[in-house]
Amino acid sequence: MAKKSMLMRESKRAKLVEKYRQRRNELKQLIKSSDDFQVIMESQEKLAKLPVNSNPVRYVTRCKQCGRPHAVYRKFNLCRICLRQQLMVGNIPGGRKSSW
């Protein structure tokens, strides 16, 4: 189980990403579309002044059950370990053990 502080940090990042998503996309689009060097530089400065944690790259998907940050399946929001446990119990329909 992940520490509560890590889970809270990730939820805070998720909120910041959503809050600044539109503003960040507008600035990036302005940088790409503009030919004026001064406008590009001003837009880059505004983009740099946004909170660091509002960058979507810093957001990490975590397992909803245990909080593990690696090997999380987006479809289920579960890590590989919890997904396997849920499949074995039968809580996720359609899953079965593979054999070859």
From Swiss-Prot:
Superkingdom classification of source: Bacteria
BP GO terms, sorted: translation
Metal-binding found in the keyword field: yes
Cofactor entry: Zn(2+)
Cofactor note: Binds 1 zinc ion per subunit.
Segments crossing the lipid bilayer: none
GO terms for MF: metal ion binding; rRNA binding; structural constituent of ribosome
Cellular component, GO annotation: cytoplasm; small ribosomal subunit
Alphabetical keyword list: Metal-binding, Ribonucleoprotein, Ribosomal protein, RNA-binding, rRNA-binding, Zinc
Signal peptide: none
Residues bound to Zn(2+): 63, 66, 79, 82
PROSITE patterns, per the entry: RIBOSOMAL_S14
Family: Belongs to the universal ribosomal protein uS14 family.
Biological role stated in the UniProt entry: Binds 16S rRNA, required for the assembly of 30S particles and may also be responsible for determining the conformation of the 16S rRNA at the A site.
Oligomer status and interactors: Part of the 30S ribosomal subunit. Contacts proteins S3 and S10.
Protein name: Small ribosomal subunit protein uS14
Encoding gene (name): rpsN
